[in-house]
């Protein structure tokens, strides 16, 4: 009996970075998003996306139904006043993003979310759940929190789960699969005594990667992609961890006599 042929599909990833109005995704706004879609076999860039996000208001995200109570007209009017998401001065200064820039160049949040969904769908190259793109980022759990906030605010959690690789957690929430370049860098550089921090700019410098305009989402995505690509190539070279990229003997140090 002939062995059934298996088609080798193409795995992809979306390299992601946010700039935000603070560190807490439950109350702070997204201010800028950047993405690059890549093939995981060659790290060829398939597409790019970057936008500022217009200021938006805080929204209720469900929870247990509340008991109805009678309210005065004044109370109703006060509740109708929207509460803006937090845009902390320190965060805006850190990223060199102003509220005026967001008002004039920012895209409405729901439009951005729809474009993120379309971006992931467009750059999925093979059919089947295992070929949905994974996320790649530097300290990516931070970005995932803000990505989940955006999806919830736009009401597109279902579509989010349809286009990205991931699983449903104990509480029924979709958790996207991701690769953190901090972990990839540790795999490659943990034995390097000159590496004492895994901040993006320091890892990029150690690996010989040029980082332009740090703390800009688009520039950070490019550097993150290059870090992931370089770490991947080294791990594919039978354990070559030398920064100079020279071949090292396969014999492990602790086996040498």
Regions found by a protein language model. Give the residues of each.
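Short alpha-helix plus adjacent loop in nuclease-associated cores
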Residues: 166-193
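Short, glycine/acidic-enriched loop or turn micro-motifs at the edges of active sites
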Residues: 20-22, 183, 223
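Conserved nucleotide-sugar donor-binding catalytic segment
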Residues: 209-211
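Acidic two-metal-ion nuclease catalytic site recognized across multiple nuclease folds
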Residues: 1-7, 204-206, 215-218, 222-257
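Pyridoxal 5′-phosphate
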Residues: 200
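Conserved non-catalytic scaffold segment of RNase H-like nuclease domains
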Residues: 2-141, 215
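Glycine-rich, phosphate-binding/catalytic loops in enzymes
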Residues: 30-34, 151-155, 223
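Substrate-recognition/cap helix-loop segment adjacent to the acidic, metal-dependent catalytic center
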Residues: 142-176
